[in-house]
Amino acid sequence: MRTIISLLLLSAMVFAVIEAISLEEGLQLFEGERGCVGENQQCADWAGPHCCSGYYCTCRYFPKCICVNDNGK
């Protein structure tokens, strides 16, 4: 009886780990598919929206962070 209960608990733990990994991978794919913002648009590196390629987020006038051209930075 103990063996059966142990196997059931082990199976549940394995299932939970597999489910958590697949959920995390799905969230990462979703984050990559989100749109980006361009020059002088409001951004937040830590939470999004993120700047498009060629721009970076600067917070000179916090809390209004904006995307600026990186000019080869």
From Swiss-Prot:
One of its GO terms (molecular function) is toxin activity. Expressed by the venom gland. GO terms for cellular component: extracellular region; host cell presynaptic membrane. It comes from the Eukaryota. The presence of a 'disulfide through disulfide knot' structurally defines this protein as a knottin. Belongs to the neurotoxin 07 (Beta/delta-agtx) family. 03 (aga-4) subfamily. Aga sub-subfamily. Insecticidal neurotoxin that induces an irreversible spastic paralysis when injected into insects. Modifies presynaptic voltage-gated sodium channels (Nav), causing them to open at the normal resting potential of the nerve. This leads to spontaneous release of neurotransmitter and repetitive action potentials in motor neurons. This is U3-agatoxin-Ao1e. The lineage of its organism: Eukaryota, Metazoa, Ecdysozoa, Arthropoda, Chelicerata.
